[in-house]
Structures are given as C-alpha cells and as structure tokens.
C-alpha cells in the first residue's frame, strides 16, 4: 500500500528516509498470507537510490541502525519476528555493501541473509559433525551487494546455494545470479519461496512447508558431497 509513496516520495527525490520493516517473510507465522511480505526485498531492490538490508540478529541490527543513521539517502531494512541466538559480534561495525564469512569450507558455498542465517548456521553445526564443511556467508546487504566477495568465492567453489525467507524471484538469489552471470558463471541453487503465496502456521512449520528449514538445507548440501 505504501510502495507508491516509497517510489515517488522517497526514491524519486532521494530523500533521507529510513524504513525499518518488522515481521518480514514467513517468520510472521500465524498472521498468514495477507500479513506475510515475501517480496519486499525484490520491490525495494528495484527502487533507485534505496539501500536494502536484512540483518540476521539483534547485535547486527543494532550496529546497522547506527550505520544507516549516518548514511545520507533512503534505506529499507527488513527485520524478523522470532527471537534468534546472536551470531555476530556486538562490537562489529556494520558496513553497507559488505558480506560476512561465517565459515570457510570447500566445494559448496551457502549464502544466506536475514534470519535464515541462523537456520543455516545451525545446519552447519550438524554438517560439521558429519565431516561435511561448506562455506557459509551471511549477506546482510542485498543492495548494494558485496560483488567482490561473490566473485572470489565463485572462483573457489563448485556450487553456490542462496538461502532466504523470500520469493526466489528478485531477492538474494536473484542479486547473486545477476552479479555472477556477468562476472564468474557458476551453478547457483536458489532456496526460497518458489513463487507461491504464504500460508498461516507457526514459523517453523512454514519453513518446513516451503523447504527452507534446517533439514531441507542439510539435505541439499549433503547431495553435493556424495
């Protein structure tokens, strides 16, 4: 409903407005499809001048707010509903346009954003016990995205898996594909909501239903190490 205002009143005039949107993605849970915004990152990525962010935990969100308060220009930042364990350092400065390597591995590189990074991090713990060691990158900055980090890891891995609580069209997976198709083509698997409308249910139930939970990621990764 407010998208046209963001487009004409903020983007067009390049106003110094910050939008912090809570309850993003399927994490909204029982409120159902009418309240689940699973295409917001795609919408705001297309608006000129907008920075688009999706931090993974409270530590990073706190640092991101400090950073965007000093940034001149429009920003859209997505936050979740559920509580998650902090992965990032509370003192680590947030830099727009930079990703974060959480684990250095081989063959498979998982790139996640927002609260899905916690899901991916938990999956990584299980995989390491099975002697499977993929790389995990957290990408809180969707626009601008860390182009150099993407190209660097595309050169050293056989496959990239994007992992997001968002429609696979227009979100993190699309942003990654756009960069690498032009600079370092590599096989990319986009794990997200596959062009469907959301449903009502607890967040963990919905992640399972749309195959973007911990078990789904583990299964996908194991297949590439066989």
Spell out what each predicted region is.
Residues 28-29, 80-226:
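Thiamine diphosphate
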